[in-house]
């Protein structure tokens, strides 16, 4: 059977392939009870570069190690985190594909260390050759979601640009904490509406990672493959790496910097060693400040444009709300006028009915009086007729 723990010096898939013959020997000759899906075709795939971002202590470094299949990054189970600068490590999969992983310090906060954050972002892109293929936003299931993490997408859009979400995969670490609480992953997300707001813009791309060394090899291989499937999906949907243009620009600036360095070296005989060192130091500082200034200007521009966009959105929403209120008042007024008209018509109708009833009543009284008068006249006529007959007899 596969080893229950992963050797530190071998990638997951390499271990799986190494142990596959031993697994085969332990199976029945007829292969009963075995269902295997295995595709060992050495299909050429381009190198992929993955960027790990998230709060310090969420397990970014451990996740990077799981992806690479070796302890490439320093990782300790503590909230403060151990990564202090961007670092790139690589591994080659059994199919020949190269996977590059960039680990970062916490890059959520826009203040007070904006300059440090910008320096590290520049370093991220200087480490990549063809841009970034996927951004892995790492959360820990054992930690409560902080206010800083709730605004993660906003911060990342400001720092990396609004298109960052098209390249994002959400990675959840510390799966074992769910087992301790007796919850399923789906139940956890159902009770966390903030995560729904984060996952929706990312097309619900999410992977559950177990980074502990005692995790089964098969589980580690499965979670890494699930992640890489998402990476290929992102590459297919977007057609190119993220910020490849910026990476090329940084490398072009570095090339220009190296040319300047060479020019200084060629002037070696014209200046003292101290003067040469000072010139080199000044040039390095100027180059770094130039890149940093450009990056900070981009971040400030993004912040300003975001602020203006939000203000415009609020203005439009306020205008729309006022328009709705105006229309509601107009409808209410029209409704009130209609109700008043209906009430007036009903009052007139009731008054008309009352008058009609009164007229009928009066008419009935007149008819009754006429009938009485007619009966009296008839009686008088009868009496008169009788009186005449009596006179004739006499």
Curated annotation (Swiss-Prot):
GTP binds at residues 54-62, 75, 211. Residues 173-176 are annotated as: G4. Residues 45-251 form the AIG1-type G domain. Keywords: Coiled coil, GTP-binding, Nucleotide-binding. Residues 103-106 are annotated as: G3. Residues 81-85 are annotated as: G2. Gene3D superfamilies: P-loop containing nucleotide triphosphate hydrolases. It holds the Pfam family AIG1. GO terms for molecular function: GTP binding. InterPro entries: G_AIG1, GIMA/IAN/Toc, P-loop_NTPase. Induction: Down-regulated by aphid infection, 2-aminoethoxyvinylglycine (AVG), high CO(2), isoxaben, and propiconazole treatments. Up-regulated by brassinolides. Residues 210-212 are annotated as: G5. Residues 54-61 are annotated as: G1. Residues 289-387 form a coiled coil. One of its GO terms (cellular component) is plant-type vacuole. SUPFAM superfamilies: P-loop containing nucleoside triphosphate hydrolases. PANTHER family: GTPASE, IMAP FAMILY MEMBER-RELATED, IMMUNE-ASSOCIATED NUCLEOTIDE-BINDING PROTEIN 11-RELATED. Belongs to the TRAFAC class TrmE-Era-EngA-EngB-Septin-like GTPase superfamily. AIG1/Toc34/Toc159-like paraseptin GTPase family. IAN subfamily. This is Immune-associated nucleotide-binding protein 12. The gene is IAN12.
